[in-house]
Each structure stands twice: as structure tokens, then as C-alpha cells.
Amino acid sequence: MRLREALGSWFGALPYGLIAAGAVLRIAPHPANLAPIGAMALLSGAVLPGGWAFAVPVAALALSDAVLGFYAGWPWVYFSFASIVLIGMTLRPRRTVLRVAGAAVCSSVLFFLVTNFGEWFGPLYPHTLAGLRADFVAAIPFFRNTMLSDLAYSFAFFGIYESASRVARRRAARLGAAAHRTT
């Protein structure tokens, strides 16, 4: 029995649960940049098939932005989370605590670089090296929360997923052994 069959409806509901959780947690009051979307994009890339991997974080962002309101830099934010899905896909062959932590850190850095470079293109900062530097310096206080949330939510999401997978593997082994005894 395959893992997805053993997980049954739980695995099928995973994308929808992630979308709902991501949107709700992003809308709920929280400190700036302390949201689960980066970790959700990582997990989606690591465990969901093809289009679902990208659809989950984009749908969570779109749902929450429909409530919160879209903003000038949204294309940069969406692009950064789609890129984080690609980082998550590098975890597919082997997910370890160290690899998940490294992917979470890389995701935080990528989000910081992409979104702040995009912010620099806007009207707030002069389009000079001094303006670029001012933009990145102003963003440093927010980077801490991005890093903390990506690490904490990644450990939580991957831990929950791996625990559920372990339970499903045991269930599949029991069902397989029971089917084998009856034949």
C-alpha cells in the first residue's frame, strides 16, 4: 500500500488545510513578518505534486490579500514565495532537520532580497546605490521575524507531516500484514 493511500483523505485534504491555515494565520493579528507562508511554501514544494506545490502558497496569499488588501509590492512577494516552493522541491529526495533548517534560512534570505529589491524599484527610495542600501538597512529589523517564523513554522509543519506519514506507514504495514494473513 502506498503512503498516499494509507494517508487516505488526510493527504487529499492537505493542500486545502494548508491554504486555509496560511490565510487565517496571515490575517490574524501577528507581529510584522511573523507568518507561516514561507514555511507553507517550503512544505508544499517538498511534499505536494506539481501544480499543487505552487497553488497552495499563491492561493493562501490571494485569499488573505483579498481580505487585507493588495499592496504595491505584491508581485515581488508572490514571486518570492513561488521561488521558495522551488527550494522546498530540493528537499524531496531527503528531508532531515538540518536540511529543513537550511532551506528555511535560504527561504528567509531569498524573501528578504527579492522583496526589498522590489521595494527599491518603487517610489519610496531613490534608484541609486545609496537608495538600495537605505532600503535594505531599513528592512533589517523585519528580517529577524522572517527568519524566526520560517524556522519555527517549518519545524512545526514538517514535524506534523512526518509524524502523520509515520502513522500512515504503520497503518499500511498493519493493513498489508492483515491482508497477507487472510490470503
Task: Please state what every model-predicted region is.
Residues 1-9, 165-183:
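Membrane-interfacial, low-structure loops and terminal tails that flank and connect transmembrane helices
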Residues 53-64, 100-108:
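Central hydrophobic cores of alpha-helical transmembrane segments
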Residues 24-25, 44-51, 87-95, 160-168:
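Structural signal for the C-terminal ends of transmembrane alpha-helices
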Residues 24-35, 59-91, 95:
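Interfacial aromatic-anchored transmembrane helix boundaries in multi-pass membrane proteins
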Residues 16, 31-43, 75-83, 117, ...:
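Membrane-embedded alpha-helical segments of multi-pass membrane proteins
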Residues 4-5, 90-100:
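Membrane-interface helix-boundary motifs at transmembrane edges
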Residues 96-177:
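Membrane-embedded alpha-helical hairpins and interfacial helices in multi-pass inner-membrane proteins
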Residues 1-46, 52-55:
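Hydrophobic transmembrane alpha-helices
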